């Protein structure tokens, strides 16, 4: 069966494994967008290390979970977000101002909303985690 949205599948797998209390989760297929999204999550300490396994096909990723993640999800379609509209999306998607991040894809790469605000750039919303 053809996968329509590999990022959505990966984030849902992480979400389900986290709810079940698993220590690791296997994601396949691997893509650059998933790797960048996981890097942002790891930078903020919501997941542990992850390892990319090259099987000469689509690839796999093994993610170590820390138990800190409450929810992660994808926003589809990928809405355009200007810098001034970021506050509105933050209020809609995140539970509070203290924690949680929206992940954007911008011309400067894939980053969280705080880094996008610092770099003064908008982009398209990929997803969120808290």
From Swiss-Prot:
Output this protein's name: Small ribosomal subunit protein uS8
**Per the annotation, which location comes first and is thus the protein's main one?**
cytoplasm
**Quaternary structure?**
Component of the 40S ribosomal subunit. Part of the small subunit (SSU) processome, composed of more than 70 proteins and the RNA chaperone small nucleolar RNA (snoRNA) U3.
- Keywords (A to Z) from UniProt: Cytoplasm, Nucleus, Ribonucleoprotein, Ribosomal protein
Phenotype upon gene inactivation: Morpholino-injected embryos have a thin yolk sac, bent tail, and show a marked decrease of erythrocyte production.
Superkingdom of origin: Eukaryota
Q: Name one GO cellular component term.
A: small-subunit processome
